[in-house]
Amino acid sequence: MIPAERQKLLLNLINQKDVVSITQLAESLNVSHMTIRRDIQKLEEMGKVVSISGGVKMQEHLSFEPTYQDKSLLFHTQKEQIGKFAAQQIPTNTTIYLDAGTTTLEIAYRLIERDDLLVVTNDFSIAHFLMTNGQCELIHIGGTVNKLNHSSVGELAGQFLRQLSIDIAFVSTSSWTLKGLTTPDENKLPVKKALLDAANQRILVSDSSKYGKVATFHICPLTRFDRIICDKNLVEPVQHAIKELTVELITV
């Protein structure tokens, strides 16, 4: 059986269940585990499936952005670990961008003693926290208010960002795969694209639960990032594939 035919059968098998193990797939098609893993890697690169611990599942479509409140309740320990590590990597006398999100808020929590930083953000919760507790200089970029996500979005926000030169951008997302970042909210595109252009170094900060989800609007390929900081639950095949893209991956 040629690979294309086998991969089509794999998709049919995976589509019938929520999660299928490598062993189940190998037995169903009477091929080796190694053959199945190669096929899965190919299907994942095509954006069809997602590797998870112990198996594989169909890629999940994200149709709407979770609210800020909902995000704050999910995977808190992983976000804390990512935020702590990311904050420790920030050099002195740096201009950084903290993208809107609960993971980047964890970075902000660890910057209250830093009086050598200029922090730029589109997140109202981050701005309020640093304005109240921090010693850094602070810029909120303004723009159209997204109340559910406590952030500013749209072309006005993007225009402001295009006037800046940022040393390090810490970028958040609700959906990413090996093909890159996506969003269900078209209004986020101007901000995301402008901050990626404005930054000298781009770091994606995301817990592993966001991996494998895809939304309607494409933001950028994964190769736009210099580094990805994620938790250790990101499965090994995905970690290996990211490193093959020559993007530095750090799991904490």
Per-region residue spans from a language model:
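Conserved SAM/SAH-binding loop
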Residues: T104
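HTH-adjacent hinge/linker in prokaryotic transcriptional regulators
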Residues: I2-E5, L9-L11, N15-T23, E27-L29, ...
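Conserved phosphate- and dinucleotide-binding cores of soluble alpha/beta proteins
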Residues: I2-E5, L9-I14, D18-Q24, N30-S32, ...
